[in-house]
């Protein structure tokens, strides 16, 4: 992907991404051989353009555009921004299913939309590729009972003929994926839904020794089984899964560092079980700091910088793309905590 982005003589960027000519058949995040299925349960043949891959391609172009601009490559930056805008328009045209009010899982080799309801769409919240007018429908669908188990969002809807609560990618719940979706919910301003998913993950962690989440768990709901069930070969500890809870914590506290400017944006959203949280040894650039976040008797959240060993400005601001956050709320967020 990096080679596509940074070839000085390349005249145009690819649009919808499918797959590399080498490697596994399924080259989205769900890379097992049976992970991408049509509505009737048949496996989709390669090449496949999964929805989440387009979102990460979109985000990569935007971030590389910023880098190009900073490095003085202004023409290249504008090309990347234009390509990102075009990709977002094409994605929302080709992947949106107006009947289901949801995005499809993928485009098959004939560019037909695979209208299977999966967790993959949640990644598109995090990357920002979803059109604003579709956000509420997408969030409601992700948290519907056939996808949201009560422990997390399933990889596949329970309504699908291929659903198996103990499969690797066809019904299980992945904590690392749910952390990504949690980040996307908060990024887009869905605070109540962010808390709902985060608290489900906390309850899930309590089932395991040392609150260590396994690689993946089953898709059983609490009213079906007292636990979500265990995927037979789930690893614990597991590398990428170890990032799940740190990302959830970052999401709930709204931490967004701008290290080069010695700035840390915060916007704490505390669950009912968290009256206060302290972070110690937080690095932002060359500065190490400690912060306290708490909720007062009126259910308002506050932040205090406890200590720092270098320059750092802590500023409260909601996520830049949050739906429904107007100028008034952003200005009020700048007022000091009492």
Q: What are the roles of these predicted feature ranges?
A:
Residues 1-8, 56, 63-66, 79-97, ...:
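Alpha-helical scaffold segments in carbohydrate-active enzymes
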Residues 171-178, 188-197, 205-213:
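Active-site-proximal binding-pocket segments
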Residues 9-50, 89-173, 206-230, 247, ...:
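Extended glycan-interaction surfaces of carbohydrate-active proteins
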Residues 45-59, 76-79, 83, 116, ...:
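Short, contiguous, pocket-lining structural segments
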Residues 3, 53-74, 123-134, 178-191, ...:
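Well-ordered alpha-helical scaffold segments within catalytic/enzyme domains
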Residues 157, 216-219, 223-228, 261-279:
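Acidic, turn-prone loop/beta-hairpin segments
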Residues 234-278:
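Catalytic cores of secreted or luminal carbohydrate-active enzymes
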Residues 67-82, 86-94, 98, 185-196, ...:
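Beta-rich accessory regions
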């Amino acid at each position: 992907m990096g080679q596509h982005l940074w070839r000085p003589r390349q005249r145009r960027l690819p649009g919808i991404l499918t797959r590399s000519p080498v490697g596994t058949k399924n080259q989205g995040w769900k890379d097992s051989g049976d992970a991408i299925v049509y509505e009737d349960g048949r496996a989709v043949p390669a090449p496949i353009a999964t929805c989440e891959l387009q979102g990460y391609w979109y985000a990569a172009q935007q971030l590389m555009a910023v880098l190009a601009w900073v490095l003085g490559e202004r023409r290249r930056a504008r090309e990347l921004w234009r390509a990102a805008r075009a990709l977002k328009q094409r994605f929302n045209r080709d992947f949106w299913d107006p009947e289901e009010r949801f995005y499809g899982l993928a485009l098959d080799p004939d560019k037909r939309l695979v209208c299977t309801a999966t967790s993959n769409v949640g990644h598109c919240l995090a990357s920002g590729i979803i059109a604003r007018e579709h956000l509420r429908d997408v969030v409601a669908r992700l948290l519907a009972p056939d996808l949201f188990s009560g422990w997390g969002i399933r990889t596949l809807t329970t309504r699908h003929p291929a659903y198996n609560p103990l499969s690797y990618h066809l019904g299980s719940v992945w904590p690392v994926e749910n952390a990504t979706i949690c980040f996307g919910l908060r990024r887009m301003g869905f605070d109540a839904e962010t808390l709902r998913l985060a608290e489900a993950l906390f309850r899930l962690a309590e089932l395991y020794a040392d609150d260590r989440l396994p690689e993946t768990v089953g898709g059983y709901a609490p009213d079906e089984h007292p636990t979500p069930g265990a995927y037979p070969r789930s690893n614990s500890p597991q590398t990428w899964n170890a990032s799940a809870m740190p990302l959830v914590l970052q999401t709930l506290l709204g931490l967004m560092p701008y290290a080069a400017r010695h700035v840390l944006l915060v916007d704490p959203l505390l669950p009912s079980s968290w009256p206060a949280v302290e972070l110690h040894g937080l690095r932002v650039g060359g500065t190490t700091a400690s912060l306290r976040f708490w909720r007062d008797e009126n259910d308002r959240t506050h932040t205090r910088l406890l200590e720092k060993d270098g320059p750092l400005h802590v500023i409260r601001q909601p996520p830049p793309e949050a739906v429904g956050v107007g100028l008034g709320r952003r200005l009020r967020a700048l007022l000091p905590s009492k």
